């Protein structure tokens, strides 16, 4: 059972927190993480690409010349795929790229992603971050104190002041515990969780 230090926003020790082994000490299987990340990214694709087939390209109604007697190769339409300005054969058509991943597999992958950050000593737990006003400079100062360059910060609940102060800092992404995803965890080398966010995630995944 892992016990991690809890820091305040100035990176001073503020206590300890015991992490649930069934959430933070799960064997990592890359093939499951790969499946869930692929499903996530596939779901982001719009799939609106389209090329014109012979059914959609304009023109091509009349036969260019008679079938026999001209000495030329026979042709039935000037919108054939072999003609300049003709249709596209087997081109991309609108489609849905997303595919379903079972809920249990998604939850398992989330546990694996969290476990990988703990095992790699890239998980930091903080009491919380409080800012007196919406100001990027203030959040940047806190990020500097915590040693954050490229990190995913997970808050227990939505905080407009924090969200607006952090959104312009390159490499820092701030989300709430209920928005947590495998893709976001793996995208950032460092994971910073508020103490309340840890409790929320553990309650959801146990």
Swiss-Prot record:
Gene3D superfamilies: 3.40.1370.10. The keyword Ribosomal protein applies. Residues 55-80 are annotated as: Disordered. One of its GO terms (cellular component) is ribosome. It comes from the Bacteria. Pfam families: Ribosomal_L4. One of its GO terms (biological process) is translation. One of its GO terms (molecular function) is structural constituent of ribosome. Keywords: Ribonucleoprotein, Ribosomal protein, RNA-binding, rRNA-binding. The keyword Ribosomal protein applies. Part of the 50S ribosomal subunit. Belongs to the universal ribosomal protein uL4 family. PANTHER family: 50S RIBOSOMAL PROTEIN L4, LARGE RIBOSOMAL SUBUNIT PROTEIN UL4M. One of the primary rRNA binding proteins, this protein initially binds near the 5'-end of the 23S rRNA. It is important during the early stages of 50S assembly. It makes multiple contacts with different domains of the 23S rRNA in the assembled 50S subunit and ribosome. Forms part of the polypeptide exit tunnel. This is Large ribosomal subunit protein uL4. It comes from Nitratidesulfovibrio vulgaris (strain DSM 19637 / Miyazaki F). The lineage of its organism: Bacteria, Pseudomonadati, Thermodesulfobacteriota, Desulfovibrionia, Desulfovibrionales. The gene is rplD.
């Amino acid at each position: 059972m892992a016990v991690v230090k809890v820091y305040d926003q100035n990176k001073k020790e503020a206590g300890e927190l015991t992490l649930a082994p069934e959430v933070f000490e799960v064997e990592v299987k890359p093939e499951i993480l790969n499946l869930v990340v692929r499903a996530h990214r596939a779901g982001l694709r719009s799939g609106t690409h389209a090329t014109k087939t012979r059914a959609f390209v304009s023109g091509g109604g009349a036969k260019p010349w008679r079938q026999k007697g001209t000495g030329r190769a026979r042709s039935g339409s000037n919108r054939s795929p072999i003609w300049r300005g003709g249709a596209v054969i087997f081109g991309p058509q609108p489609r849905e790229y997303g595919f379903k991943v079972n809920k249990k597999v998604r939850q398992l992958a989330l546990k694996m992603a969290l476990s990988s950050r703990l095992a790699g000593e890239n998980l930091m737990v903080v009491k919380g971050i409080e800012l007196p006003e919406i100001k990027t400079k203030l959040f940047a100062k806190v990020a500097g104190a915590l040693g954050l360059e490229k990190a995913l910060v997970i808050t227990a609940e939505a905080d407009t002041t924090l969200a607006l102060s952090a959104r312009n800092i390159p490499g820092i992404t701030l989300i709430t515990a209920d928005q947590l995803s495998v893709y976001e965890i793996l995208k950032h080398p460092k994971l910073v969780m508020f103490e309340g966010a840890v409790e929320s995630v553990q309650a959801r995944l146990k």
